[in-house]
Design a protein with these regions (language model features):
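Eukaryotic scaffold repeat domains enriched in small/polar residues
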Residues: 20-362
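Sequence-pattern detector for short linear motifs
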Residues: 8-9, 198
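Bacterial N-terminal signal peptides that target proteins for export
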Residues: 1-8
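Bacterial N-terminal signal peptides
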Residues: 10-18
Length: 362
């Protein structure tokens, strides 16, 4: 009798949800970049704004909630700063929430990371993930790099408060053997450089760059990323350029960008990423977009536009960006507290890390 009653209630709930879903379906035209009549290179895929878009609610929990008339409990992204993406997982730092979120769309769950040994995460900035799945987080208040395993359990820290003024950017070799930390410094600081550490022992190895505007020097270096050919791309934000340098000698190999509001220029460069072909992606908080350059520094295209309403592809305060294994671009906006996802035209909507179906929760 109880099983029959449960089945009836579940059927009623399913019909109710199906009706709501049918009412919510709205057909929208594809948002493409670059726009017609150009050949599409990227398609807007989705916007992530809260945990309910990731977490899979169990059938029992859904039934219980409907029976008592409760709304589903979800939480927003806070003030996202940076992110990394690997194997269907989004690792995102929430600078005001003092935590790192693992948005696991494959498992359908969200993990919060707050504890860091004897410390608590305070001001998480850049996030990176090694091939082994270890999570690296720069904390601007603790002034160290925090390392966690794939489950979010604390492993160790790298660096100390006396070694940095304002650590912001982070790059990690695939095997975790070297960790690069961009120290943004400040107006009165001379620490405008990249500090390099042994990723296994935590030993400080050497520094790259100094304060200035000459090749190989930096003014407010922020986000950094390693390129497929083993070079280091540095967002030299105060000099309004991206410098590609040798990660051992610090010598400049090439540079791209200049100050300005036109395409190919930078006004407030923020997040930086690189794809498998060596193309450099740079988000700009003033321009409200991500510009894509080839490895020679030539502008290829841009994705997104500045807009004061939260529509797909509109950004008012873009920050961190990342690429997944399929070439999808994940772009944070701090003002709208969202992540917009764009897929390459060569990748289907539900291919790779977006493959369906996701597992059901019992």
């Amino acid at each position: 009798m109880l099983n029959v009653k449960k089945a009836v209630l579940m059927l009623s709930a399913a019909m109710l949800l199906q009706g709501c879903a049918q009412q919510a379906v709205v057909e929208v035209a594809d948002i493409v970049y670059p726009p017609a009549p150009n050949e599409p290179r990227f398609y807007y895929q989705e916007t992530i704004m809260h945990s309910g878009q990731i977490e899979i609610e169990s059938e029992d929990r859904m039934l219980q909630r409907i029976l008592v008339g409760q709304n589903r409990t979800v939480f927003g992204l806070g003030k996202p700063f940076d992110l990394a993406v690997k194997n269907g997982r989004i690792y995102m730092s929430d600078s005001t929430g003092q935590k790192v979120l693992i948005l696991d769309r494959v498992a359908g769950k969200v993990i919060e990371i707050r504890d860091a040994g004897f410390d608590q995460i305070s001001a998480p900035f850049a996030v990176k993930v090694s091939d082994a799945g270890d999570i690296y987080v720069v904390d601007g208040t603790l002034k160290k790099v925090l390392v966690f395993d794939e489950n979010g359990d604390f492993i160790k820290s790298i660096g100390s408060s006396d070694m940095f003024d304002k650590p912001t950017g982070l790059a990690v070799t695939a095997d975790g053997s070297k960790v690069y930390v961009a120290d943004t410094g400040g107006v009165s600081s001379q620490r405008h450089h990249v500090r390099v550490f042994n990723g296994h022992t935590g030993e400080h190895l050497y520094d790259l760059g100094s304060r200035g505007k000459e090749p190989g020097q930096f003014n407010l270096p922020k986000n950094i990323v390693l390129t497929p050919d083993g070079l280091l791309a540095v967002n030299d934000s105060g000099n309004f350029r991206i410098q590609i340098i040798d990660p051992i000698t610090g010598d400049e190999v090439r540079t791209m960008g200049s100050i300005g509001m036109s395409f190919g220029q930078f006004a407030r460069p923020k997040g930086i990423a690189v794809d498998v072909d060596g193309n450099i992606y740079v988000a700009d908080a003033q321009l409200g977009n991500t510009q894509i350059f080839n490895k020679e520094g030539q502008l290829l295209m841009h994705i997104g536009q500045r807009g004061d309403n939260n529509r797909p592809g509109n950004f008012l305060l873009p920050a961190g960006i990342a690429l997944d294994e399929d070439g999808r671009l994940y772009m944070i906006d701090q003002f709208f507290a969202k992540i917009d996802v764009f897929r390459p035209a060569s990748v289907g909507k539900y291919e790779g890390s977006f493959a369906l179906p996701r597992p059901k929760q019992k």
